[in-house]
Every structure is written in C-alpha cells, then in structure tokens.
Amino acid sequence: MTTNYIFVTGGVVSSLGKGIAAASLAAILEARGLNVTIMKLDPYINVDPGTMSPIQHGEVFVTEDGAETDLDLGHYERFIRTKMSRRNNFTTGRIYSDVLRKERRGDYLGATVQVIPHITNAIKERVLEGGEGHDVVLVEIGGTVGDIESLPFLEAIRQMAVEIGREHTLFMHLTLVPYMAASGEVKTKPTQHSVKELLSIGIQPDILICRSDRAVPANERAKIALFCNVPEKAVISLKDVDSIYKIPGLLKSQGLDDYICKRFSLDCPEANLSEWEQVIFEEANPVSEVTIGMVGKYIELPDAYKSVIEALKHGGLKNRVSVNIKLIDSQDVETRGVEILKGLDAILVPGGFGYRGVEGMITTARFARENNIPYLGICLGMQVALIDYARHVANMENANSTEFVPDCKYPVVALITEWRDENGNVEVRSEKSDLGGTMRLGAQQCQLVDDSLVRQLYDAPTIVERHRHRYEVNNMLLKQIEDAGLRVAGRSGDDQLVEIIEVPNHPWFVACQFHPEFTSTPRDGHPLFAGFVKAASEFQKRQAK
C-alpha cells in the first residue's frame, strides 16, 4: 500500500485555521472509507509544549500514549476516529535534540552536521514513520510561510515530494483573502504574494484554501487560479461559519475531496456526512440553555481550556441544551467573593499549576458543595475540592497541597515519588526533578465503585482516561476525610491512587484526577460532561420552581 501525503501550509497571517481545515478534510476522506491520520510539525525550539505557558501557547493536549502535544491534535481527534500519538506531533526542539544525541554518539561518522541533510532527513524520517499504515496523511506545518523557523520543515517536505513522487503528494496552502469595505471587494494580492514566497523555496501549491469572512466570488477565485498557477477547481473558498462542524460539508460541496481522490487515483465511495449533519442539527436546535461557570487561572486565553470548552458543548449536544460558558478568573473569586458565582447553573474547575488563584478555586468548590450546585472538578479541580472538604468538613484546619505549602500540617495532596516511565520502568522523583516530561501522563485504567454516580454515568466497572499531573491524593490522610463523608468513587488500576471523588447527599458533585475532556468528541460526547450538563439543566429547573 502506498501512503499519500497532503502537506498543509499557511500564509499571509497566523491563526488562519490550518488545523481545523486539515481536520475537516480528514473527516471527509475518512467518511469515504480511507484510513487517515494527521500530523503537526511545530517550528518552536521547545522539545514539546509541556512547560509552555497556557496563556502563550494554549492548551497542552495529551495523547493516549502520554505525549504532551499541540492543541491542534485535539481538533484532529474530535474530527476523525484515529487516535493521535507521540508520532503525530514533533517540534524543531525534538528534532535538534535527537540529531545532537546522535552526533554525540558518533552516528554521523565524523561528518559535519548541518541543517541539510541531517535536520531535514530527521524530519522526513519522522513524517514517514507517522504515515506508516495509512492511506492518506495530512501534515500540517506550524507557523506562516516566510518565518525563518519553519524553513527546515518546508525544505523537508519539498524533498519528500521529489522522493515520493508528485502522484502521491499534494501541497495545500491556506491564505487570507481580506474584504476591503472601502472598495467593497475582496483582495487577492496577499494570496499571490504568499504563493510567490512558497515558490521561492521550490513549492508549487496544488490547492489553495482562501480564508475570508465571506464567500470568495467565482471571478476572484478564477483570478487567483490564473496568477497562482493552480486549477480553478482547486481554489476553495472557506468563509467564516458559526460552527466549525459545518466546515467538512462546506469543503465537500466544492468538490475538494473528489479532486484529491482523483489526483491520488483513489477509488473510494462518496463521503457520507450524515453524522456531521446530525451534530449541526443538534447544535442549531437546542430545547433549553444553561449557564456554566468555569473558574480557572488562564481564562484570558480561552484556548488554554480548548478541550474543556468543546467537551461542554458536546455535553450540551447530547442533552439538546445550549451551553453558555462563563469564564471566571479564580483570583476574582479571592478579591470579590462568591457573589460572582451566583446565578450559575453549574460550576467547573479545570486543571492548572502553581498557587496563584488556588484559594479562589477552593472557595468555589466550597460554594458549589454548600449550595448544592452541580460541580465538576478536573485535575487541580479535584485537588481543591479535596482540600475544601478536608478543611471545612473533616476539621483539618489549613489542609493544603505540598505543591503550594510544602510544610503544611495536613498535606492532603502530595507529590507521588514513584512513577513509571513510558517504558514501564520505575523512577523516583522529587520536587527538584525536571518539570518537563516528568508527570503521570497518558491513558490509565480506573476502577469504579459499584454504587457511585460515575459508575452509573459510565455504565462500566472499569474505564480508561488520560492524565497529566504529578501530585495526587495523600493516602496517609485519606481515612480521616472518608470518615467525614467523602466518597472515593474511582481508584487506579493498581488500587494505589485516588482517581475520582464524590460528595454524597449532593445532587451532582464529581471531581476526577484525570482529564475527561481529551476523549470527548462531538459525535460521541463523554459520559461525565453529558451527565454534568444534564445536572445543570435539572438544577436550573429546581431553581425556577
């Protein structure tokens, strides 16, 4: 089987939506029965985004095998059935790290190590490795054409097109086609210059995706085709839409998938997008609306919580409920009090690191618990719920996490000192260990307690969810908290770690150490988020009586 590659680049400006466009195209090709995957090549020097600020970079998406990756991989998994892995995302930093390690070992036999061929060869090897076993691989190059950082990646894919053959490679370029209100027309010149930039490094785009706030007229698309040396049917208009799940249908309506299948000589049936049509229908026709407050530390950049926001929307789809998400800075809870939490139908506290804003999160968990407001805590959101319960119910005054107060009297959350690495080897770690790549990461098994709420929601005795944390519930102090009424609803597969807690005699209070948002999709949803949104709707109805 020959693997076909579609290389996706962007020009003119950043944040054009390459990831969404690539994922949408992959969804159409998958609907035609093809085995599809997507890769993201990031040009920054960090080895991975694990230690980057969420406010700068956005969310870190965790794959099943424990890779800390770009948030675009979350889009990929929400659009196609293929699960991402560490093979689907790598950075300049990772490539250089690998090449330098080989140089130190003497693998290059004394050669002068250079960008070409050593760096470009390493990039090509990883792309080919990631594409094994698939009919079509979409490879998204991060950044914008013209950036100095992305040049090695662009050179590598140029070489791949020559080596693999143009019959099995395609270049798809996204550009901005701005609308000028003064003249009442769209402008194609930025696109022409962007293509010129690509041509200067030896890449002729085969497909142009024209991003605009409105449909690009046929005459303007013809003009772009003429000046950019691209077939007119390969110039695609991608206007702004009110739902990203409409994009597969928008691309299909312009024959993009037919053009690609013909170019690759792929004989496959027409795409059936009925599942996406159902998602769009549910999204457009809710029967009610709820307001859910998300109290976090990084709310100034919503992309820091991208998967959580999408998972809440998916939970709404499963209940035919429109979810209005109110982003609340946890530090505002500290300074302004719980007044800003009133009027919400449910409260979610997501993950995070560091002490800033944590007391506001603890106050939030207490407010939800004492006022019977549905509460979902994720990662840090579980830890603050535990701290609240320890302080205010179990009489453990000033209980805290050793992450925030190392010498606190009641360290109910503490660092796990023994970890297993990606090869299953036990490693001993401490507060002085490296921050990067030293967490409990990836899919882990969790055993659910029979009479728990989560057991009903999942309808399964054992589940697998993804983790990203280095602190856990301190088992040494757990009995005192359980004696005060807190229920442990889920434990790790080896029964050593607390994974889920619930507050009995509360309508809906669930907190988990894992990240359920990473496995939620628009077509399937997720049991926790579906149950959470349903609880918010029921709470709203009770309040209205």
Swiss-Prot record:
Alphabetical list of CDD domains matching this protein? CTPS_N (cd03113), GATase1_CTP_Synthase (cd01746)
Chain segments carrying region Amidoligase domain: 1-266
Detail which positions bind ATP: 15-20, 72, 239-241
Q: Name one GO cellular component term.
A: cytosol
Instruction: List the Gene Ontology MF annotations in alphabetical order.
Output: ATP binding; CTP synthase activity; glutaminase activity; identical protein binding; metal ion binding
Activity regulation text: Allosterically activated by GTP, when glutamine is the substrate; GTP has no effect on the reaction when ammonia is the substrate. The allosteric effector GTP functions by stabilizing the protein conformation that binds the tetrahedral intermediate(s) formed during glutamine hydrolysis. Inhibited by the product CTP, via allosteric rather than competitive inhibition.
Catalysed reaction equations from the record: UTP + L-glutamine + ATP + H2O = CTP + L-glutamate + ADP + phosphate + 2 H(+); L-glutamine + H2O = L-glutamate + NH4(+); UTP + NH4(+) + ATP = CTP + ADP + phosphate + 2 H(+)
Q: Where does CTP bind?
A: 14, 147-149, 187-192, 223
| Binding sites annotated in the UniProt record for UTP | 14, 187-192, 223
Q: Does the record carry Transferase as a key word?
A: no
The segment(s) forming the Glutamine amidotransferase type-1 domain are: 291-542
Residues binding L-glutamine, per UniProt: 352, 380-383, 403, 470
Task: Identify which residues the record assigns to the active site.
Answer: 379, 515, 517
- NCBIfam families, per the entry: PRK05380.1, PyrG
What does this protein's UniProt record list under function? Catalyzes the ATP-dependent amination of UTP to CTP with either L-glutamine or ammonia as the source of nitrogen. Regulates intracellular CTP levels through interactions with the four ribonucleotide triphosphates.
Q: Subunit arrangement?
A: Homotetramer.
Further details from the record = CTPSs have evolved a hybrid strategy for distinguishing between UTP and CTP. The overlapping regions of the product feedback inhibitory and substrate sites recognize a common feature in both compounds, the triphosphate moiety. To differentiate isosteric substrate and product pyrimidine rings, an additional pocket far from the expected kinase/ligase catalytic site, specifically recognizes the cytosine and ribose portions of the product inhibitor.
Q: Which family does it belong to?
A: Belongs to the CTP synthase family.
| The name this protein goes by in its record | CTP synthase
Q: Which organism is it from?
A: Escherichia coli O127:H6 (strain E2348/69 / EPEC)
Which lineage is the organism of this entry classified under, starting from the top rank?
Answer: Bacteria, Pseudomonadati, Pseudomonadota, Gammaproteobacteria, Enterobacterales
